[in-house]
Amino acid sequence: MAAWVPCRKWGWAAVSFGRHRGLIASLARKPPWAWWLSACRQKTTLSFLKRPELPSLAYKRLKGKNPGIIFIPGYLSNMNGKKAVAIEEFCKSIGHAFIRFDYSGVGSSDGNLAECSVGKWRKDVLSILDDIAEGPQILVGSSLGGWLMLHAAIARPEKVIALIGIASATDGVVTQFHSLPVEMQKEIEMKGEWSLPSKYNKEGYYSIPYSFIKEAAHHCLLHSPIPVTCPVRLLHGMKDEIVPWHRSLQVADRVVSPDVDVILRKHSDHRMKETADIHLLICTIDDLIDKLSTVTH
């Protein structure tokens, strides 16, 4: 068991009780980027997964040892973000497989964004798992990706052996919508669109179709126990203005797995892409790989 207490360097530090020592040791080591930046110079090239009657998905794949790692991006984010690239460099350095991809309608993938939905992006994740990934996988989901990784673990329990959520936005857009005054909800329904303010979009807001919100409601998970039994690690910034950090506590409470850690960063925001945030993410992945490899052997 591990408890988390305030620490000047990290915002939170781990105090270990018993067997759970891997992450504690990782945090005490020198920062991972000091060695993985000089690792293998292997380049991943852009490829496309062709799917009958569905948009082709753009992806980059690094072949290597299992468990492999799959990065699932956030809402309207592409595969080239700082976290995805950092994980790829780390996987190169240790020889493990890695996949990053774009949702349909986003980035280099085919598809019409206006027709996209949580359900369709869920299918995208499963397509990557079924048709590209080989062997057991650790899923790393950022924001919306943290919601979709839970769905993937439920649908493919034999292949998904661990989850890492970064500012997991489970049920996010639906919860936000229903927190609005009833009059505003009706106005959005009549208008057919919700202009959601966001400092992370150059326009200053996201235009979310009402149909997207309505469809997303069919994929909510927090209303009942979540049948995920693998190890789960949930990282969240306490300065997150988009998805409150309490959401990760809700997810931790709802998943049935007994092996769940919630790790809070006191001064981190929703994106969690500062140097110390990336360090924590890489150490968490490293710890899970070590834990799962020990169990396997």
Curated annotation (Swiss-Prot):
Residues 1-43 form a transit peptide. Its EC number is 3.1.2.22, 3.1.1.93. GO terms for biological process: protein depalmitoylation; xenobiotic metabolic process. GO terms for cellular component: cytosol; mitochondrion. It is found in: Mitochondrion. Belongs to the AB hydrolase superfamily. This is Palmitoyl-protein thioesterase ABHD10, mitochondrial. It comes from Rattus norvegicus (Rat). The gene is Abhd10.
